[in-house]
Curated annotation (Swiss-Prot):
Record-given protein name: 5' exonuclease Apollo
Polar residues compositional bias, start-end: 357-366, 468-482
Record's comment on post-translational modification: Ubiquitinated, leading to its degradation. Interaction with TERF2 protects it from ubiquitination.
The keyword Cell division is assigned to this record: no
Oligomeric form and interacting partners: Interacts with TERF2; the interaction is direct. Interacts with MUS81, MRE11 and FANCD2. Interacts with HSPA2, HSPA8 and HSPA14. Interacts with SPAG5.
Species assigned in the record: Ailuropoda melanoleuca (Giant panda)
Length: 529
């Protein structure tokens, strides 16, 4: 990743690892090449500053949300705050980097002095005529693209490299031309070749969309056979591809790059056409600016020693204003918006278990309404007790109409899947699906969450069913509802109090440990005073 955190400032350029960003709060993107966007994705949720073309591309191809993208016009100066109270500001000016569509250099001016960040750039003399640079400003720190910073590498200008490509194509008038490119860059070279040879240049849909955005000449097409010049991905240029292309039509391939690449086929031609400044161009650029220090952007390629004779005296480390320091440290103490949203979501009460259809109580409900509701419940419990005392078997059929369509044969009622039991209560009309023993349900009386464990005991009442054994919800297990159960039968006083309190009659009241012959006797015994 070719990016940097600028010390003693909240500025980060081409740096997208928030975990390692430290106190960086202002993030800038110089251009859209992949080695400068590592870590940048659709999940990015911080303000991002870039050129208008890069703003379009970063949303179109990386799906960065528009709400976080801040497009800054090239050639203009923009004032940005450096704290949360507006006391400290900085000025940032974007200048064309002559590297690829949308690429820019950033000139930062503030309490830290003047910092020029070139990003990837190809030097031209016109850069020194930029209004932001020609006023003789002292550059305190120069972040320099040092990709080709090696005296042993001699590179031609792009005009000279383009001329070499034209001459090579002229030597192969009957050949198709495959030009290997990266996903972004050298579109102007393709336009130049199309106009020179009066032919269409065949592009991929993605690159065609880009050249239309740039407003280049109408010399590009998607039709494979419309022209003899084809722009392809540089990874497609290989030995096997050359064999395949030459089987159908004579073809040569051109790789316009300054990188050292092994030629795997005699028809692959490498032309040193580079979008990075040569060593001699870097020397000219640094000598004209005379910065106080040079910081290489490509850390694996040191270059400081090459410019010692072009540097101005270094300045002391700038003091960070208190308001800026607080701004840089604020996010380390303050939770992010996403964290707060998650916290709020977790704190929001969620409906779980059984939901009852009833009118919602409002905060201003009168005490008279509460008393009326309480009296109604007491009358309901009394009616249930009277019905149970007069017609126990009839009451059994009312409580379990699905199970009593025919005479009970002593086996446990179950669904077709043998996994779930449906329990109906009277006089309420809803059904409760008893789930596995590690789930929770809501208490019928309090609405609180109550665990359904091995003993079906409501919270706050441990006397009713504590001695009755296990009531398994999954009938495929060794359930007390089967004849193999060793659990003791329910005691009448215990169950009667529980039934009146919770309006719930468990199935094992009628089935646990009862034979078909002794069922009526057990019912009569239960209702004796």
């Amino acid at each position: 990743m070719n990016g940097a955190l600028i010390p003693h400032t909240p500025i980060a350029v081409d740096f997208w690892s928030l975990r390692r960003a430290g106190s960086a709060r202002l993030f800038f993107l110089s251009h859209m090449h992949s080695d400068h966007t590592v870590g940048l994705s659709s999940t990015w949720a911080r303000p991002l500053y870039c050129s208008p073309i890069t703003a379009y591309l970063v949303h179109r191809h990386l799906q960065v949300p528009k709400e976080w993208i801040r497009a800054l016009e090239v050639g203009e100066s923009h004032v940005l705050p450096l704290d949360e109270i507006g006391r400290e500001t900085m000025t940032v000016t974007l200048m064309d980097a002559n590297h690829c569509p949308g690429s820019v250099m950033f000139l930062f001016e503030g309490y830290f002095g003047t910092i020029l960040y070139t990003g990837d750039f190809r030097y031209t003399p016109s850069m020194l005529k930029e209004p932001a640079l020609k006023l003789g400003k002292q550059i305190h720190t120069l972040y320099l693209d040092n990709t080709n910073c090696n005296p042993a590498w001699v590179l031609p200008s792009r005009q000279e490299a383009a001329r070499q490509i034209v001459e090579l194509i002229r030597k192969h008038p009957q050949h198709n031309i495959k030009i290997g490119l990266y996903s972004l860059g050298k579109e102007s070279l393709l336009e130049q070749l199309a106009l020179e040879f009066q032919t269409w240049v065949v592009l991929s849909p993605r690159r065609l969309e880009l050249v239309q955005l740039l407003g280049l000449a109408d010399v590009f097409t998607l039709e494979e056979k419309a022209g003899r010049i084809h722009a392809v991905d540089h990874m497609e240029i290989c030995h096997s591809a050359m064999l395949h292309w030459n089987q159908t039509h004579p073809t040569i391939a051109i790789l316009p790059t300054s990188r050292k690449i092994h030629r795997s086929h005699p028809d692959i031609h490498i032309i040193p056409y580079s979008d990075h400044s040569s060593y001699s161009e870097l020397r000219t650029f640094v000598a004209a600016l005379k910065p106080c220090q040079v910081v290489p952007i490509v850390s694996r390629q040191p270059c400081r020693d090459y410019f010692q004779d072009s540097l101005s005296p270094r300045l002391s480390v700038p003091l960070i204003p208190d308001s800026v320091q607080q701004y840089m440290n604020s996010s380390s103490r303050k939770p992010s918006f996403l964290w707060l949203l998650l916290e709020r979501r977790l704190k929001r009460p969620r409906t779980r278990g059984v939901v009852f259809d009833s009118s919602q109580e409002t905060a201003d409900q009168s005490q008279a309404d509460r008393d009326s509701k309480k009296a109604k419940n007491e009358n309901l419990s009394g009616d249930l007790e009277k019905q149970a005392s007069r017609h126990p078997l009839q009451n059994k059929k009312q409580l379990f109409p699905d199970f009593c369509s025919k005479e009970w044969d002593g086996t446990a009622p179950s669904s077709e899947s043998q996994k779930m039991v449906t329990v109906r209560t009277a006089p309420l009309s809803f059904s409760v699906h008893v789930r596995s023993t590690d789930e929770n349900f809501l208490s019928l009386e309090t609405g609180e969450e109550t665990g359904v464990g091995p003993h079906l005991v409501p919270r706050g009442d441990h006397d009713g069913l504590a001695a009755t054994g296990n009531q398994s919800a999954c009938l495929g297990q060794d359930s007390p509802l089967s004849h193999r159960s060793k659990a003791a039968p329910l005691q009448a006083p215990e169950f009667r109090g529980l039934a009146l309190k919770y309006l719930l009659t468990p199935v094992n009241f009628f089935q646990a440990q009862f034979s078909s012959r002794g069922f009526d006797q057990q019912v009569e015994k239960y209702h004796k005073p």
